[in-house]
Amino acid sequence: MEAVVNSDVFLTSNAGLKSSYTNQTLSLVDEDHIHTSDKSLSCSVCNSLSQIVDDDFISAGARNQRTKPKRAGNNQSQQPIKKDCMVSIDEVASTHDWSTRLRNDGNAIAKYLTTNKYDTSQFTIQDMLNIMNKLNIVRTNRNELFQLLTHVKSTLNNASVSVKCTHPLVLIHSRASPRIGDQLKELDKIYSPSNHHILLSTTRFQSMHFTDMSSSQDLSFIYRKPETNYYIHPILMALFGIKLPALENAYVHGDTYSLIQQLYEFRKVKSYNYMLLVNRLTEDNPIVITGVSDLISTEIQRANMHTMIRKAIMNIIMGIFYCNDDDAVDPHLMKIIHTGCSQVMTDEEQILASILSIVGFRPTLVSVARPINGISYDMKLQAAPYIVVNPMKMITTSDSPISINSKDIYSMAFDGNSGRVVFAPPNIGYGRCSGVTHIDPLGTNVMGSAVHSPVIVNGAMMFYVERRQNKNMFGGECYTGFRSLIDDTPIDVSPEIMLNGIMYRLKSAVCYKLGDQFFDCGSSDIFLKGHYTILFTENGPWMYDLSVFNPGARNARLMRALKNQYKKLSMDSDDGFYEWLNGDGSVFAASKQQMLMNHVANFDDDLLTMEEAMSMISRHCCILIYAQDYDQYISARHITELF
C-alpha cells in the first residue's frame, strides 16, 4: 500500500462520532440470583462483596450516614426500552466550574449538527473547527480538542449527554428491569455508608496533599507482614505512586458505586463523578468478566474492583505495600476480557488494560489508517488507553535505535491483527509487518508540521513495550510457572517529550526484573523474575522493588541504602565508603540490616541517580508513563475559564 503524505491528515480523519458500542453478549440481569455478602463457590461477585463487608476502614467511631430517599420513577421508566433509542442524561449531571463552558460549547456544536442535518459518519476535526468559527467558539488550547470532541460525541441527541440504551449505566438510570432495584437495595446493605464515606474522604484528602512518594518520605514503608503473601503490584505503584493528571480525577475523585447510586435514584451526578461518567458513556467496547453473565453484575463487580483499587491507593500513600489475600486485586484484573483486543495479552498488558478499563480511561487520541473491506483504508481518530511498542517487530541498528522522543512521537499506526495502536516510526521497518497499516502523516518535516500533530493527549500518555518472547505459546507466569525470555533491546527513552507545545515528563516506568544487573555486572540472566517500578519524584528517581523474597536482592538493596546514606554525609562523594562502613557506619549498617530483615525501609534507601534509572529503563522497561505536571494541568483549565 502506497504511503500517504498529507500534513492535514489529522484534521481530515474520521472523528467516529457515531458510537460503535454494543453489548449483545450478556443478558441484562440475572433473574434467579441476587448478589449478597455470603461467600459462594459459584459466584465471584458474592465473594468480592463478602470481602468488602469484612473490610474496616475506620479506626474510631463514626456516625452512620443516612441514605437519601429515592425519587419514584414514572411507570414508563419501568418498561423495557428499545435498543436503538437514546436517553438524555443532561438533567442528572452536574460539572466542575472549569468544565461547564467546555460542555456548553460541545452542546452548541451538537445542536448545530442536528439542526443542519450533518452526516456524522463522515465528521472530521476540520468540520468541527469550521463550525466553531461560525459559532464564534474560541479554543486556543489544542489539547481541549480532545475533551471537546468527546462532549460532541456524547451530546448529539437533543444537545445532552446521551448514548445508546444498550449501555449498562443507561439501563440502570432508566430502570430497565425491577430486578435492578432489588440488587441495588442489597448493595446498600453491604456498602456501609460510614465505611465507604470514610474511604472516599480519606483518599480525596490524601490526594490534596500528595505529589509522589516523596510526599510520604517521613513514613516507614512496610513491604510485608508475616501473615501476608500479596503485595501492591508494581503497575499499581507506577499509576498511583505519583499523581497523574486525568487518571487521578477518574480513580480518586470519581467512584463507580456512588455513580450507580446517583443514576438509579435520579439524583444529580456529582461533579466529582462527571468525568468518570463521560469516560464510561463514550467507551468504544465493553468488558466481559469471567464468570459474570449479565450486565448489572458486571457493573457491580466493576464497582467492587474500583473500591479495592481505591483502598490500595490509600495504602500506597501511607507506605503500606502489602495486602491480605482478600484485598489482592490482581486476580480480579486477570479475569477481565477486553473485547476490543483480538489477541492474548501478557500479564503486564492485561493488568494495565484492566485497571484503565474499569474507569474507561483512554487519554490518547491518534489519527490512524483503518482498513476498509480489506482493499482500502480510511483515516480515523482512534482513542487509545496506551500505545504499544514491539521491539521484536522493529529493525534497528546502533545508528537507528528505537527512540521515544519529541520527533518520533508523531508516528503511530493501527495493528489490525490485535486492534491496538502501535508506535511505528517509518525508519525502522514496522510498516512491512503483517496487519500494520502504516502511513507517514506528517511527511518529511515532522517538527515543522507539529501544528498538525496526529496525536493529542489528555494529561497522560502511556506506552506498553512488548519484550516477552513466545508470549503466544504460553500463558502468564502466575498460572503456568513458565518463565518468559525477555528481549533486552535498548530503547532511547527521552525523559521529556514536547507535544503540542506542552511538556510531558517521564513520571514512572515498570521494568522487568531479570536479576540485579546493576549490582552484579556478571549476571547474564534473560529470564523474567518479576517487576519493579521507578518513579521520578521531586527528590529524584525512586525504585519500588519487592526484594523481600530473595536474599541476593535484599543484599543489593542494603548496599544501595548504605551508599545513599553515605552520599548524604559526604556531599554525594563515593570516596571512602568502605572505610566509613567499617568504622562510623557500622552501627547504621546493622540497624538498616535489621530494618530490612523486618521488611521495613525508608524512602531515601531506594533513591537512584538519573543515569542509573535511565540505564535500567532503556533495556528492561515494559510500561512508560509520561504526563504533564498535575498543577499545570489543573491551572490551565481554570485559566481557560477566565477567557
Curated annotation (Swiss-Prot):
**Entries under InterPro entries matching the protein:** P4B
Disulfide partners:
none
Name of protein: Major core protein OPG129
Tell me the function of this protein.
Major component of the virion core that undergoes proteolytic processing during the immature virion (IV) to mature virion (MV) transition. Essential for the formation of a structurally normal core.
GO CC, sorted alphabetically, is:
virion component
How does it get modified post-translation? The 73-kDa precursor is cleaved to a mature protein of 60 kDa during virion maturation. Proteolytic cleavage of major core proteins OPG129, OPG136, and OPG098, which occurs at a late stage of core formation, is required for production of infectious mature virions (MV).
| Record bears the keyword Transmembrane helix | no
Coiled-coil residue windows: none
Q: Which gene encodes it?
A: OPG129
Q: Which organism is it from?
A: Vaccinia virus (strain Western Reserve)
Question: Where does the sequence pass through the membrane?
Answer: none
